[in-house]
Amino acid sequence: VAPSEPSPGPAVPATGRWSGRLRVARVFQETPDVKTFRLMNPLGGVLPFTFLPGQFLTLTVLTDGKPVKRLYTIASSPTQHDYVEVTVKHEAGGVVSGYLHDRVKEGDLLDCSGPTGSFVFTGRECKCILLIGGGVGITPMMSVIRYLTDRAWAGDVYLIYGVHAPRTSSSGRRSSTSPAATRTSARSSPCRTPRAPTGRARRDGSRRS
């Protein structure tokens, strides 16, 4: 991360793996320990790369003079050509997550590369999809759901989402869903929400209290 001016980048989005710097345009506090970082082309205009829903970026930060890399799944939709978002949980003792949460601010530049990953869904693979995620692990699912919504996909979307408690849910700020989406959520610890299902999900779809 650096506050300096960026070097010139490509004039058109790259279709393969890209490497360079992106500017932190916005930082959203999703939960007490989860932040979303909105990254944009420091030169303005569209992103210098394209991606598929479900792919991730590699972020590199310098700690103690050494580069440290971490992979973060893209949470935004590929239809948003002007920015890309990654959602990061502050893990206890996490070198990069701690750096991002404690030191990175709007206007900073982040060294990024990508996109990478084959866990993708564009709507062409089948006519319905079941997504299962927990905690901050919902980020690739949110990218998929937002993309399908933006494209007015006619298929059925089912989302099973588990969190430890309501305040730890990472999907609250812009939990856009497909008009055909069905969502089931469960919390592993009790909460005050009336009739909120509690328990860990089993393989057969039931919950273990």
Which ranges hold each PLM region?
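FNR/FR-type flavoprotein reductase catalytic core
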Residues: 3, 10, 15, 93-209
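Ferredoxin-reductase
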Residues: 3-108, 127, 163-165, 190-194
